Regions:
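Catalytic helix-loop patch of NAD(P)-dependent Rossmann-fold dehydrogenases
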Residues: 1-32, 44
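Short-chain dehydrogenase/reductase
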Residues: 4-16, 47-54, 77-78, 108
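Active-site beta-alpha turn of Rossmann-fold NAD(P)-dependent dehydrogenases/reductases
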Residues: 5, 34-36, 104
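Conserved active-site helix of classical SDR/Rossmann-fold NAD(P)-dependent CH-OH oxidoreductases
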Residues: 13-20, 24, 54-57, 86, ...
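Conserved sequence/active-site signature of Rossmann-fold short-chain dehydrogenase/reductase
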Residues: 31, 38-40, 84
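Active-site loop/turn elements of alpha/beta-hydrolase fold enzymes
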Residues: 35-38, 71
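Short beta-strand->alpha-helix junction loop in the catalytic core
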Residues: 40-42, 136
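C-terminal substrate-binding subdomain of Rossmann-fold SDR/epimerase-dehydratase oxidoreductases
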Residues: 60-189
Length: 189
């Protein structure tokens, strides 16, 4: 993580360094959790990485296919919000301090695979469209190794991506009014 070339990564390293410095200077106990690409009910539309699922589902809701920026080979580690909650509990119960853990599944999912999965789950027959991706894209591949979290705080992600996406789609379908309000609020910003 220390060979990044963007401000996003630099801020993450800075935050971790500050927490470590506080621990060693003032005795502040902490555990840092590095969440991979979190998804789930009530998902935020503003996040640079997490919004990809919601944007694809919005396109499908409009009767369009998902749009991928780039060739679809960019890959991420999608982890459910329920698994993130479990990681928080594991970290609070653990004896660990002054440590950082990846919260993810360790599973690599390309944007093309994600789009295909969403098309299958929604029974949408529209094709995926591809557009040029900006070279300013912050991260092109982000898959976390979950082994340290498993070994030291007892956390293992439990939710399969396909199952989690099914739950997310059901939530969207059950609460269309709230979804519309979130979309409108995001558009106003």
């Amino acid at each position: 993580p220390f060979n990044n070339k963007n401000f996003y990564g630099a801020t993450k390293i800075c935050g971790e360094s500050m927490a470590t410095a506080f621990h060693h200077r003032y005795g502040l106990d902490f555990v840092g959790l590095r969440y991979m690409n979190v998804y789930g009910a009530r998902q935020d539309y503003q996040g640079a990485y997490i919004a990809v699922i919601m944007k694809m589902l919005d396109a499908i809701d409009r009767g369009e296919g998902p749009t991928i920026l780039g060739d679809g080979s960019e890959a991420f580690d999608f982890v459910s919000v329920e698994d993130c909650a479990l990681a928080n509990i594991c970290a609070m119960k653990a004896k660990a301090t002054d440590e950082f853990y990846n919260v993810g599944t360790g599973t690599r999912t390309t944007l093309k695979e994600l789009a295909e999965m969403l098309l299958e789950l929604t029974e949408c027959t529209q094709p995926i469209s591809y557009r040029d991706r900006s070279e300013a894209t912050l991260v092109k591949n982000r898959i976390g190794c979950p082994e340290k979290a498993k070994r030291e705080i007892g956390f293992t992600a439990k939710e399969d991506l396909k199952f989690g996406l099914t739950k997310l789609i059901e939530w969207r379908n059950d609460d269309k009014d709230a979804l519309l309000r979130r979309q409108q609020k995001a558009a106003e910003r």
